[in-house]
Amino acid sequence: MKVLIIFACLVVMASAVCNRLEQILVKTQWAQSYGEAENRAAFSRDLFSELFNIQGSSRALFSGVGVDDMNSAAFTAHCLRVTGALNRLISQLDQQATINADLAHLAGQHASRNLDASNFAAMGQAVMSVVPTHLDCFNQHAWGECYERIASGISG
């Protein structure tokens, strides 16, 4: 009976979106790819460059933050704010109440920006493209599950 209960718990855990094991993996891989302070600006700009390669129309969404010069201080600062928020959310994946409050706050901020599901999907593709270039091994399934948790929390 004890084995059956443990097995049932493992099945539930494995079927959960962004389960505990996936959370640990994503946190570890994010820390490796996001790197240290001196590398974060380049990493962040690379993420946005890839976003614009995937969805060129999204570039217009950033006209107010200096996107015309992707190496400008204004655009770099914006990129760092976005990846800083992503860093914060990834660190909260195992803290349901905290991440839910943070996602609700970010959803409120993004509601007025006329974003749709395709914008969040494109950012997810950019993450899935850039993060692995900084790793020896990348778990696409775990990242897909955990990014979906974040994106759906912001986009509603």
Curated annotation (Swiss-Prot):
Q: Which cysteines are joined by disulfide bonds?
A: C18-C146
Record carries keyword DNA repair: no
Name the positions where heme b binds: H110
Q: Where is the Globin domain?
A: 17-156
Which first-to-last residue range defines the signal peptide? Answer: 1-16
Gene3D superfamilies given in the database record:
Globins
Alphabetical list of InterPro entries matching this protein: Globin, Globin-like_sf, Globin/Proto, Haemoglobin_extracell, Mb-like_M
One Pfam family per UniProt: Globin
Family classification: Belongs to the globin family.
Q: What does this protein do?
A: The extracellular giant hemoglobin is able to bind and transport oxygen and hydrosulfide simultaneously and reversibly at two different sites.
The name this protein goes by in its record: Extracellular giant hemoglobin major globin subunit A1
Source organism = Oligobrachia mashikoi
Its gene is ghbA1
